[in-house]
Amino acid sequence: MTRIIAGVARGRKLVVPKGEDTRPTSDRARGAIFSSWDARFGIEGTTVLDLFAGSGALGLEAASRGAESVVLVEPAPSACAAIRRNMETVGHPRVTLAEMKASTYLTGAPEDHFDRVIADPPYELAGEAVTEMLAELRRTLRD
């Protein structure tokens, strides 16, 4: 069972798309990621970009923990359906879903906009494609 582990939506259950295309991040891993972020940078009031969002669990966790706004980017229709349900469950008004490939989103993303980025790309994504996206991503990050 995937759930929000901390913050205002703590304990709310999330749906995960059926099939093998989405690999939900475990509660333990999410807890470690956010504990590290919070200790080092803080999450309160930040803008977060979640690429390859899957179920949206990572971005929604950020929203629950106080992120100002979150953009979830996911191209798969079944994953987007799960994300929409999870957005309703969490109820954060400033979480948006961009139903497109990460590379497409990054091409038109605003410059100097995001404080934090979460990216959990599929295993089969080629290294060169990831490198190109990272270069494009740099432009969207605040210093």
Name the predicted role of every residue range.
Residues 1-143:
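Class I S-adenosyl-L-methionine-dependent methyltransferase catalytic core
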